[in-house]
A protein has these predicted regions:
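Generic hydrophobic, amphipathic alpha-helix propensity
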Residues: 21-31, 47-48, 68, 72-84, ...
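Cytochrome P450 catalytic-core helices
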Residues: 176
Length: 232
């Protein structure tokens, strides 16, 4: 369980040029360093220096690097997990193909809007071997279960019987996670790109284009009914 500090920090070494709360500034600075330099290679002093605070002040907000990493990892998944129930409710009459397409769109949005492309962190060896990653596995498993459950309902019979729901869910998550790779290469994640990724998820389930096209149209309409906010 995360321990959140509520004490005010010490005076800044460098005045802040952002209106974001100090805790958010620490997360933003850490995300930039973890993604570009690596989690293991980044010190709390470097994070504090980037924010413009004393190293001791960082500990008013976090117990250390692992807690910072745990929160960043969660932010790359939690926004999608929190919308799974709403997705299934909205698509109850539209069918599982629409539900799967909509889930993929929401997940793509989460990864595309995540600050500093923090979705990439889950692919770094120094992150996957950290204690913080253990907690992340649990929430990530929730999302994989949702993908697997919905995909099994939508998939062609041969796919549904050949792949266990958990394995199918993991496969689809990996397809969607190409979003982070595209971001790191500088490619824009626009509506057209999101549609290609989401459609690929359905094709991987053996769903023909004759069913993907209406599912995409329905999901694109329904996405406007979701509370879509970028991870902070």
């Amino acid at each position: 369980m995360s321990i959140r500090r509520t004490h005010p920090g010490r005076p800044r070494l460098v005045p802040s040029n952002t209106a974001a709360p100090p805790r958010e500034q620490v997360l933003h600075a850490a995300a930039q360093l973890f993604v570009t330099k690596g989690f293991a290679a980044t010190s709390t002093r470097e994070i504090a220096d980037k924010v413009g605070i004393r190293q001791a002040s960082l500990y008013y907000h976090f117990t250390g690097k692992d807690e910072i990493l745990a929160e960043l990892l969660e932010r790359s998944v939690r926004p999608t997990v929190e919308r799974v129930d709403q997705i299934e409710q909205l698509t109850a009459s539209a069918g599982p193909e629409t539900a799967l397409y909509l889930l993929a769109l929401v997940d793509i949005h989460t990864l595309a809007e995540a600050p500093d492309n923090i979705g990439m962190l889950a692919t770094h060896p120094d992150v996957t071997s950290s204690e913080a990653f253990d907690a992340f596995r649990s929430i990530r498993a929730e999302l994989a279960d949702a993908y697997g459950r919905i995909a099994t309902q939508a998939a062609a019979p041969g796919v549904a019987t050949a792949a266990e729901p958990g394995h199918l869910g993991e496969m689809l998550m990996h397809l969607v996670e190409v979003t982070t790779t595209l971001r790191s290469s500088g490619a824009p994640i626009d509506d057209a790109t999101a549609a290609v990724i989401a459609s690929t998820c359905l094709r991987a389930c053996g769903i023909p284009d004759s069913r993907i096209t209406p599912a995409a149209a329905s999901a694109t309409t329904l996405v406007g009914e979701l509370t879509m906010s970028a991870p902070t």
